Amino acid sequence: MKFLISEAIYENKISSLHKIQKSTIYMLGAIIGDIAGSVYEFSNTKDYNFEMFPPGSNFTDDTVMTMAVAEWAMKNDINAEADVQTHLLEETMVDMAINVPCPMGGYGGGFHTWLFHPERLIDYRTGKSASARCPYNSCGNGSAMRTSAIGWLYGDMETTLRVAETAATITHNHPEGIKGAQAVSAAIFLARNGASKVDIKEFITAKFHYNLDTPWEYLHKTYGWNSSCQGTVPQAIISFLTSDDFESAIRRAISIGGDSDTLACITGSIAEAYYKSIPEYMVEKAMSLIPVRFKKVLEMMGEKGYCYDKNIL
């Protein structure tokens, strides 16, 4: 199939990339999108020229869990037993949630219970109380919004998709929850390795069967709240595909309405990898809001991942 051919082409490009310098801090696209959309999540705007970062803008649970997955991925041994990998991920996510409370919004009901009240979990497979934290068959967009680091860290598509599945299934083990996480990670992987928008679209369509042909203008007129992967990820990718630069991608994602911070978080993560440039004022805003722990995660990502040539700071 065509996506298999594309996969091979883009994997071959990795050898021409170089490791970024330790001073580089990157992977801010997801964070900036989250912050930009934070005030519009429950007060949607359809105005493309909305105010960027109005008073009250801040990072949300989307950023907290993005950083948790990034921190885990850099410590994780992908060759370890599955339960070892998921146990480390669980520890990292819970630790991050406890020690870095999100200043805006909160966690979705099921995920909040999983994080803070595992004793209340019901194992959906048996209908009985769970003896420990377990996945809850969610197809929510939380699995997709937290996976951007995975698109940056690995040298081949197969590993990228496998790790994205691990990051999703600890909570979101519904097929759509897994697919959403993998699609976002794959799009970032392709974008950072020089794939064109046409190629990214063709790969995602063939591999994940998302409809990416819906005109953005139609979404702008008709789209509303949807917190599922299948109702968020395609729309976020379309916002990227129809954009002209990083900022226009964020504006397109937010101005269709819906789950604005998550849409822009996903769109921003792909747009950064593709455009390899972020406006300085957006970088400054994000860096002024995130805690030291997040900055350290970003610095570590710069040491372990591939990135574009020009430092954004």
Regions found by a protein language model. Name each.
Residues 1-313:
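Structured, active/binding-site neighborhoods that engage oxygen-rich ligands
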